[in-house]
Amino acid sequence: MGRFLASTTLAFFAAGVPAFAAEDTCGTITIAEMNWASAGLAAWVDKIILEEGYGCEVGLVAGDTMPTFTSMNEKGEPDLAPELWVNAVKEPLDQAVAEGRIVIASQILTDGGVEGIWVPTWLAEEHGIRTLKDALAHPELFPGAEDESKGAWFGCPSGWACQAINRNQFLGSDADEKGFELVDSGSAAALDGSIARAANRNEGWLGYYWAPTAILGQYDMTRLDLEAEFDRERWDTCIVKPDCADPQVTEWPASDVYTAVTSEFAQKAGVAMDYVKTRSWSNDTVNGMLAWMVENQANNEDAAYEFLERHEEIWADWVPADVAEKVKAAL
């Protein structure tokens, strides 16, 4: 604790980058520090390991999914986006990979991004709730609706793409006819607050959430089985659309989350590229670190040092032994 302060894409994984193009030296690297916590944490972990372990000069640049991808694709910078959610940029990313401008270095989240409908684990175990159908049979267990005679299904914040998806899942499951009301959480903070409030009151909660996130690191939640396979055609033509004429429940698609680099970086970065190709972690690991960030009001840099001190068993496998020793000496 020394410092507290897509199929086309997969075909072009970095394992196929020619070895002769790489150099043994590291040089100067730019990394996107994306504007959500898990990606910001990853950027700082990369920065510390590359600087302290490999002697690179690393600069962080502010980023977000689409602006960062566009800049990498059109300008060749920054060199590296640690956490790129592929579903958000799938078509242009596939094209950029196919045309040789972007290389997928690794799958940073081994579980992928996970979305779904969740309930508290204690409630699921106490009442035998495993599926969405099980939960919808008990509106009395889920307070929070404006109409107190109904159960609450907490949906996505206003303006988010998942708002329409949740509405259609709500309608497709006939939740309204089963005594539920779809609650507009208004904002991410309000959605988080509804989960925290239910936990503090030992009350039930049902609604949309995703991982990795701090909330799922703080509270033990169970993702419900929707008992419906993912249907790509139904998803694309109806579920994602606000005017879906015939909503039917379908499972959320898996969200591939990759580290992407520019082709120039892949060819010239040498040891840095070797490192990036090996680096990945689980949602449980990230959930725990994000929860620590919230509980300690820590920033990305603080959390990166905490991760390196707490989880040597994870990151030491990403690097050679001599590099690991250099990183440990810097903590």
Can you annotate each of these PLM segments?
Residues 38, 163-164, 168-178, 185-202, ...:
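An extracytoplasmic/periplasmic, membrane-proximal ligand-sensing/linker region
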Residues 38-56, 169-171:
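Short, polar/charged alpha-helical segment
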Residues 70-71, 78-85, 154-235:
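Ligand-binding pocket segment of bilobal, Venus flytrap-like solute-binding proteins
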Residues 101-155:
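A conserved helix-loop-strand patch within extracytoplasmic ligand-binding domains
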